[in-house]
């Protein structure tokens, strides 16, 4: 515990807020190329094979992005768009890949929340 005199000499420094998605560099989205597409397992109470991709961004950052929705067409060298947003049960996954943008196809047979999955309106 500092004395009042010590605080007068050197006041307390406010803690800087940490950026949750540093690779975006204050952009809403960034484009990148998939370097590896694979599945991984979530943290403890959950169990699944979550689809993720390692993406090399245009600013030469390399990040892991989650592929949402059922089924996807991504492979190595696919050009994708990422947005911020972590996946709570996948450590190290701090970005989402946008569906229906660039090389990523939208989710087939999606009826609700279509805009989140790049699905067109069914006829």
From Swiss-Prot:
Signal peptide annotation: none
Entry's Gene Ontology molecular function annotations: rRNA binding; structural constituent of ribosome; tRNA binding
Keyword set includes RNA-binding: yes
GO biological process, any: translation
InterPro entries: NA-bd_OB-fold, Ribosomal_uS12, Ribosomal_uS12_bac
3-methylthioaspartic acid PTM positions: 89
UniProt keyword list: Methylation, Ribonucleoprotein, Ribosomal protein, RNA-binding, rRNA-binding, tRNA-binding
CDD domains in the cross-refs: Ribosomal_S12 (cd03368)
Regions of compositional bias (Basic and acidic residues) in chain numbering: 10-21
Family: Belongs to the universal ribosomal protein uS12 family.
Assembly, per entry: Part of the 30S ribosomal subunit. Contacts proteins S8 and S17. May interact with IF1 in the 30S initiation complex.
HAMAP family on file: Ribosomal_uS12_B (MF_00403_B)
Function: With S4 and S5 plays an important role in translational accuracy.
Protein name per the record: Small ribosomal subunit protein uS12
């Amino acid at each position: 515990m500092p004395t009042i005199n010590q605080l007068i000499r050197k006041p307390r420094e406010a803690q800087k807020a940490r950026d949750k998605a540093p690779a975006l560099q204050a952009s809403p989205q960034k484009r990148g190329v998939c370097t590896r597409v694979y599945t991984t397992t979530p943290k403890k109470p959950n169990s699944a094979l979550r689809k993720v991709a390692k993406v090399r961004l245009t600013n030469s950052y390399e990040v892991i992005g989650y592929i949402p929705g059922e089924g996807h067409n991504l492979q190595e060298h696919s050009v994708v768009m990422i947005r911020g947003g972590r996946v709570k049960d996948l450590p190290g996954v701090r970005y989402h890949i946008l569906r229906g943008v660039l090389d990523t196809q939208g989710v087939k047979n999606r009826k609700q929340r279509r805009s989140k999955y790049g699905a067109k309106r069914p006829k």
